[in-house]
Regions:
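Solvent-exposed alpha-helices and their adjacent loops that cap or buttress functional pockets
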Residues: 47-50, 189-192, 314-317, 342-343, ...
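Hard-cation-handling environments
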Residues: 222-361, 377
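His/Asp/Glu-rich metal-coordinating catalytic cores
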Residues: 1-56, 65, 72-248, 254-261, ...
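Short, compositionally biased "basic patch" segments
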Residues: 38-39, 183-203, 356-383
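Generic long, charged, amphipathic alpha-helical segments
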Residues: 374-401
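A short secondary-structure junction signal
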Residues: 183-186, 209-211, 333-338, 362-364
Length: 401
């Protein structure tokens, strides 16, 4: 086997890897770099020489999915192999990406956008092939063949690791992985067989986990912190990834509410994450890979976030819990916009519930001391940090240990 990393930066970004097995070429994921703009965010797919015999899509986060339409445009005969749950999410997430890129073109003038259009997304949709878990799929050409099998990775709904068997050798690609069970998905269930090559993620590889850490206790700590803020008359902003993390937190809030342990305040959600609740509900009914029901929205009385944003610096008019994307507080997202209303007010809090890149606005905020200045440049507002900011370690990535 020969591996070529096509990621355009030596960091978490546009995940894409070419794996060659004899004369067969498989591409593992094809993402967009979340911190780069335009064509700079693409993986180096032009380096692929010759045809692509198959694409393995490990899951639907955009740093693994976002450039797939461009890869299929260059290699239209390639099939895209994914879990049954993942095939249900692809079109919605890519279509949303197009809308985001169109807005970016209007706002920044970047003529690269959109990088692809709906006809390109349709090509991806037609190329999708759902592969049942632990059920080998043979891919071959010119007398060469490999056997692929998918295994639950636990990271997010539909996520899988992939075992590739070729010429009596076994190569395992973990994709993004989490071994502990979450509310929407079981923990990773990888094969115990020895492998010749292991290709693994290392998102949290440089971060040690405290020996005393317990995810259940961390969730309890989050609920307690939310209640303390709300009971004192403040509001809580929970920035969350639209796909996966928002649905996890909804179920956590429902569990706390059912037990009588959640402050009786309104809960606001908006955008893609709210829409994706329907898709996870469908995946839960059609596959055994996801555990989610949109009934949670009714049980919690979820309210939509008003499109009429409050003037930056002025507190939100209604005390409550604001569960909004994006998880890293990316500019111009609902979470970023509401943060412009909350940070100046000491009764409020911003609680991060997932991984946050240090170079994103969320990472900057986590590292800021009280009283620091946080700039919302496109809003022409500089907030003085008076709200409480804290990170809760509820990542969907495996611990280093």
């Amino acid at each position: 086997m020969r591996l070529t990393d096509l990621n355009s930066g030596r960091e978490i970004g546009a995940n894409c890897m070419l794996a060659e097995f004899g004369g067969l070429r498989l591409v593992f994921d094809c993402g967009l770099h979340p911190k780069l703009d335009g064509r700079k965010a693409l993986p180096q797919i032009d380096k692929i020489q010759g045809s692509v015999d198959g694409v393995i899509l490990t899951h639907c986060h955009l740093d693994h999915l976002g450039s797939l339409p461009l890869l299929l445009k260059q290699h239209p005969s390639a099939r895209v192999y994914a879990s049954g749950a993942t095939t249900l999410f692809v079109r919605r997430l890519l279509s949303n990406s197009i809308q985001v890129m169109k807005r970016q073109r209007e706002e920044t003038g970047n003529q690269d956008y959109p990088l692809y259009v709906e006809t390109d997304v349709e090509r991806v949709e037609h190329a999708l092939a759902a592969v049942p878990l632990a059920n080998p799929r043979i891919i071959g050409r010119g007398g060469e063949e490999v056997a692929l099998s998918f295994h639950l990775a636990g990271h997010v709904a539909g996520a899988v690791g992939c075992l590739v068997e070729h010429r009596k050798q076994k190569h395992f690609f973990t994709g993004d992985v989490h071994f502990q069970a979450q509310r929407t998905v079981a923990g990773a269930n990888f094969p115990r067989t020895p492998v010749d090559t292991l290709v693994m993620e290392c998102t949290r590889g440089a971060t040690a986990t405290a020996p005393s850490f317990n995810r259940g206790k961390e969730e309890q700590r989050l609920i307690k912190a939310i209640n303390e803020v709300c009971d004192e008359g403040g509001s809580v902003l929970l920035p969350a990834f639209a796909f996966g993390r928002m649905q996890e937190i909804l179920l956590l809030l429902q569990e706390a509410a059912d037990a009588g342990n959640l402050a009786d305040v309104p809960i606001f959600c908006s955008g893609l994450g709210l829409d994706l609740c329907d898709y996870l509900d469908e995946a839960s009914r059609k596959t055994k890979q996801v555990k989610f029901s949109r009934q949670v929205l009714r049980d919690l009385g979820i309210l939509p976030l008003s499109r009429k944003y409050v003037q930056p610096g002025k507190n939100m008019p209604e005390r409550g819990i604001y569960l909004l994307s994006s998880g890293m507080l990316v500019e111009k997202t609902p979470a970023w916009r509401v943060a412009a209303n909350m940070l100046d007010h000491e009764e409020n809090a911003v609680f991060f519930v997932g991984y946050c890149d240090p170079e994103t606005p969320g990472g900057e905020l986590i590292g800021m001391n009280p009283g620091g200045e946080f700039k919302f440049k496109t809003l022409d507002h500089t907030a003085t940090l008076r709200a409480k900011v804290e990170r809760f370690h509820l990542s969907g990535h495996a611990d280093r240990e």
